[in-house]
Amino acid sequence: NGYRIDYARTINGVPVTQTIANGGALEDMDSTMETWSYESLCFYVDKDGIESMTYSNPYTIGKIKTENLNLLSFSEVMKIYEKMMVVTNADNMQYENSRVYNIDRIVLGYARIYEPSTDAHTGILIPVWDFFGSMTSESEYNGETESNTIKTPNESFLTINAVDGSIIDRNLGY
């Protein structure tokens, strides 16, 4: 028994938001693209001290491409959230009777994005809004209603680019 401690890179006082997603997933199983998972620094600590440490996919920070970006207002971000939560979950309603999100934490931080079809080793850190909380779904199976609640503290249910409002898929990394 012990603890897992995750560390996040901070740039000018703003952290890269840690989520449960590792990034670098494939769009489909037939994809031949090379992928790139997120940077991860993790310590496992038990009663005797540090048991182990992993540092994966370290970033090399280059030059700042654009300074003093204009971010979307929070009200603009919330309008995008309200619309895109419906859009991104539309296909789930084929299998579920209902799905309810309880967002209890909204975080402004950085996320790394990249274009695996162009360059799987170079990305940029962009400001994003992440929406965390819980999700409860109900579905029917053999005539009985089943309810399932997911509450993972670092699972982002939606990531919105804070500059242009586009949606970032945390699993894919873009």
Predicted segments with their positions:
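Long, terminal "pre-/pro-" and other extracytoplasmic accessory regions
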Residues: 1-174
